[in-house]
């Protein structure tokens, strides 16, 4: 037998090769290879190819040797082949990056994607055209609420579909960056076209009708909501510990999610100090007479940092009525929405989404000539750009009023 190629050994009845990988000498037996001159030469060629792949950063241990115990120890990330496996590993990694609330919503979205795409689908088979087909299915197909089948309906909103597809593209981008797939099917996938919805604020006449139809806490709640611009999750989570009636300010540092979990406001800019307009301050002073002396309740606050929670004892500004002898310490976001719908109906004014209390705040301040940067800071937006994007059409409609105001001030 001729001299063995570099890195090739004969061990009993088997041919074995060795190579250096990550600073360690690795040995792999070529099972099923008979000891012949031809196979020894092939083993030398295989070993040379592996060395080349290692040097060029292309070597995938478990692809070359799927059953290797050495490879299983050397490789820290397992090879992912199916969509279900991709969802599992992505979720495990993202749990340390996303807040508990965001993770819950994401897992709910993944349940739907797992059904539509099918868990056993090889991720290497997913093409650009498949993503577009999944998008159509999400847009026109039936919703898949497994916990509450009665709520299922045909179709989803464009915004919801865009969120699902953004999540899917994020998964596939992760798969590409991890070397699980060699193509980029997510490239070029665009958002569906959406019409910009023009804000529909309450008129002063409608607001007065709302105030006349409400009394007590309900009147205080909606008066404060309209004149402070807080998000409804921030309203529900507002505690007297956040309020300074002397200085006329509210420190917004807590939000209640739709999943009934307390955490920071939506963005870092959402943690802010709101300087109260006089009507908002008056509403809080009246509300203090109703709930300012209630006992504190303990809640769990979920920080953005993974795994960090905090117990907080608070007495909330707005509290539900006693029901069946029990007093819940705060409103849920959905119950605030229900109270808004009931109040609008009692007032006999046109129905709007509850979020329009916030739109009304912004539009009224713009009409009064407030600086968009100031409005953005009060509402918890990162920059004034958000105000221009959301209320741009409203601002354009105010041009004539702005000219009249400038003429009056400059004359």
Curated annotation (Swiss-Prot):
Name of the protein described by the UniProt record: Prophage integrase IntR
Function, in words: Integrase is necessary for integration of the phage into the host genome by site-specific recombination. In conjunction with excisionase, integrase is also necessary for excision of the prophage from the host genome.
Source organism phylogeny: Bacteria, Pseudomonadati, Pseudomonadota, Gammaproteobacteria, Enterobacterales
GO MF term (any one): site-specific recombinase activity
Statement: the UniProt record of this protein carries the keyword DNA-binding: yes
This protein's encoding gene: intR
Entry-linked Pfam families: Arm-DNA-bind_2, Phage_integrase
Stretches assigned to the Tyr recombinase domain: 197-404
Organism the protein comes from: Escherichia coli (strain K12)
GO BP annotations listed: chromosome segregation; DNA recombination; establishment of integrated proviral latency; symbiont entry into host cell; viral genome integration into host DNA
Active site: 231, 266, 358, 381, 391
Similarity comment text for this entry: Belongs to the 'phage' integrase family.
Bridged cysteine pairs (disulfide): none
SUPFAM superfamilies found in the cross-reference section: DNA breaking-rejoining enzymes (SSF56349)
Annotated ranges, domain Core-binding (CB): 81-176
Keywords tagged on the record: DNA integration, DNA recombination, DNA-binding, Viral genome integration, Virus entry into host cell
UniProt superkingdom: Bacteria
Keyword Metal-binding: no
